[in-house]
């Protein structure tokens, strides 16, 4: 199975890491979004607690838009702004403001840890034969701007931070990006039209690639919503003795299970039979799970799947916070703050979930049972109806997915 992970870095104003200009302050306050002044109050306290609260709040703010959408598979990313911010740090040596504001002792390690997670680096030790699996990583794509013009030194900084990177001009970005992905990264993908501003620069980057990703694959029989059983490649969860335990929580009208995927986890929220998907309060389910989940034994397989959907997250952000342009101000030094003006970015979500990780929109069908009787009872978890899935990095929700029609890859 070819890796198909695709990153578009967007400004989703439901999650704000930095300051905003005064005229937009009241709009941010209405949504309980973290602003520069609030972050200052949080210094030398618990690590970025307001920042995480803002991410959780965004689950409610943005998912409310789904009530007006046609039924179907949808995705949004409350963490998109964080990814954009992390990429800025890749081309700037000015990390002290970031460190001070979020109380992070090693911002470079924090950023690289996040980007490594998003790019699917994984190491699995199998007890059977001690196989070490290093999963192939993916490239990401971004357009930040209406102006994205890092100077030469900053472009060189980007190239040194990643194993490989490329910068294209606007007029030829499609052909240049295709050449970059094919020849340098080794991925064949269709580069989307993003209609960039003429003053923009498009940046592409990739991390280390490993080609022994097939070592962790297994096969399993799964039954999608159409009722036709299908045998597909899958990534194991737990182990064949069923001795590993993962977080599980039974809510008022749903159950929720956390599944480790690479450095991230996929947390599936499955409504009870007869419960409409929209009757689930995502934010409450998220917080209840974090506070009350219990470890239960688990063994099974998660199949590979993929969907494609084009989403304009700029439009979504405008609905949440109309006419608000998010930009860096006091937290950045003068020589870098003008490099980040995040506007009008289209996300083209070509999403896949596999042993490489989770990115974009998730569709999962899953059956889990025990290999033999255990001291602790198993929780059988069958995803045979519409559900939510949250891809998380620690306690930070990266992608929230509404799945109505699961489709195998």
Where are these regions (language model features)?
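Sec-dependent signal peptide recognition
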Residues: 2-10
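Detector for small/aliphatic-rich hydrophobic stretches
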Residues: 7, 20-167
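Hydrophobic h-region of N-terminal signal peptides that target proteins for export
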Residues: 12-19
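Non-catalytic, conformational "gating/processing" segments within enzyme and secreted inhibitor domains
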Residues: 71, 88, 111-272, 295-373
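Extracytoplasmic/secreted cell-surface and envelope-processing proteins
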Residues: 94-99, 277-278, 309-311, 361, ...
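Short Gly/aromatic-enriched secondary-structure transition segments
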Residues: 99-102, 218-224, 279-288
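Extended hydrophobic
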Residues: 253-269, 374-409
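Internal alpha/beta scaffold segment
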Residues: 271-296
């Amino acid at each position: 199975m070819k890796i198909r992970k695709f990153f578009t870095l967007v400004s989703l104003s439901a999650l704000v890491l930095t300051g905003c200009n005064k005229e937009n302050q009241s709009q941010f306050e209405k949504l309980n979004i973290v602003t520069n002044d609030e972050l200052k109050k949080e210094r030398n306290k618990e690590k970025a607690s307001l920042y995480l609260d803002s991410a959780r709040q965004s689950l409610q703010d943005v998912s409310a838009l789904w009530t007006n959408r046609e039924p179907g598979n949808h995705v949004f990313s409350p963490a998109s702004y964080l990814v954009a911010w992390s990429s800025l740090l890749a081309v700037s040596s000015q990390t002290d403001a970031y460190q001070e504001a979020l109380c992070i002792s090693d911002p470079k390690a924090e950023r690289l840890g996040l980007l490594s997670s998003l790019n699917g680096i994984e190491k699995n030790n199998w007890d059977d034969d001690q196989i070490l699996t290093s999963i192939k990583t993916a490239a990401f794509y971004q357009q930040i701007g209406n102006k994205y013009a890092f100077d030469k030194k900053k472009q060189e900084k980007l190239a040194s931070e990643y194993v490989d990177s490329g910068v294209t001009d606007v007029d030829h970005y499609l052909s240049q990006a295709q050449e970059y992905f094919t020849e340098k990264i080794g991925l064949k993908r269709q580069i989307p039209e993003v209609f960039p501003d003429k003053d923009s620069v498009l940046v592409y980057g990739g991390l280390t690639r490993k080609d022994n990703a097939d070592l962790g694959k297994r096969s399993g029989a799964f039954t999608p919503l159409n009722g036709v059983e299908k045998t597909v490649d899958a990534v194991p969860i737990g182990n064949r003795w069923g001795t590993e335990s993962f977080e599980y929580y039974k809510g008022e009208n749903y159950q929720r299970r956390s599944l480790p995927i690479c450095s991230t986890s996929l947390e599936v929220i499955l409504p009870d039979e007869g419960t409409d998907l929209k009757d689930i309060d995502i934010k409450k389910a998220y917080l209840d799970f974090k506070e009350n989940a219990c470890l239960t034994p688990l063994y099974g397989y998660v199949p590979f799947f993929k969907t494609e959907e084009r989403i304009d997250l700029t439009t979504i952000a405008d609905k949440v916070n109309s006419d608000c342009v998010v930009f860096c101000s006091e937290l950045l030094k003068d020589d870098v703050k003008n490099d980040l003006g995040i506007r009008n970015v289209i996300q083209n979500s070509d999403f896949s979930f596999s042993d490489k990780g989770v990115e974009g929109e998730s569709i999962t069908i899953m059956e889990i049972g025990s290999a033999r009787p255990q001291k602790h009872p198993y929780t059988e978890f069958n995803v045979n109806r519409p559900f939510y899935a949250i891809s998380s990095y620690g306690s930070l929700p990266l992608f929230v997915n509404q799945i109505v029609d699961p489709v195998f890859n």
